[in-house]
């Protein structure tokens, strides 16, 4: 069944980037933008990031109920805050997210870094197929060994500070 989790736009479905047919489907989605003359792309949040899942949100909201009407001292505040923060990128959520790779069911937490790699791969292979005579610019936030074949590596949310240039 599809894996549903929330990110920037709210609830979203995640393409199975380890599945060849899904990668081809995803890569073909670039056609519309290429037809508009777009020649540069930036894959973001493709770790993939998860803000929350419905199951985890339900559990956390139930736990937060016990704080209602309380005067939160520092310890209780940090406990409350920790519960809320536990929603985002919770490792338990990655354990219930599965991929289909060559007919084999694989748990996401075991191949986490391959998601971003294969997302960029899907785009790179699509660009070669859709625009074989053009070199399309592609940056990806998430990467893995060999990803440079398909796009450049973006180092994340850096600032224009000298100390960040050293990263």
Predicted features, each with a name:
Residues 1-167:
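Catalytic-domain carbohydrate-binding cleft regions of carbohydrate-active enzymes
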């Amino acid at each position: 069944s599809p894996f549903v989790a929330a990110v920037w736009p709210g609830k979203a479905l995640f393409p199975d980037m380890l599945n060849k047919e899904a990668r081809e489907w995803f890569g073909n989605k670039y056609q519309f933008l290429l037809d508009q003359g777009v020649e540069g792309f930036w894959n973001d949040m493709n770790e993939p990031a998860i803000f929350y899942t419905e199951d985890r949100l339900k559990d956390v909201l139930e736990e937060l109920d016990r704080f209602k009407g309380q005067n939160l001292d520092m310890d209780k505040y940090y406990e409350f805050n920790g519960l809320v923060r536990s929603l985002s990128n919770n490792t338990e959520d990655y354990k219930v997210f599965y991929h289909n790779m060559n007919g084999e069911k694989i748990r996401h937490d075991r191949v986490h870094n391959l998601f971003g790699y294969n997302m960029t791969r899907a785009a790179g292979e699509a660009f070669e197929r859709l625009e074989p005579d053009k070199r399309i610019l592609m940056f990806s936030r998430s990467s893995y060994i060999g990803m440079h074949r398909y796009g450049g590596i973006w180092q994340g949310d850096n600032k224009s500070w000298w100390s960040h240039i050293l990263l």
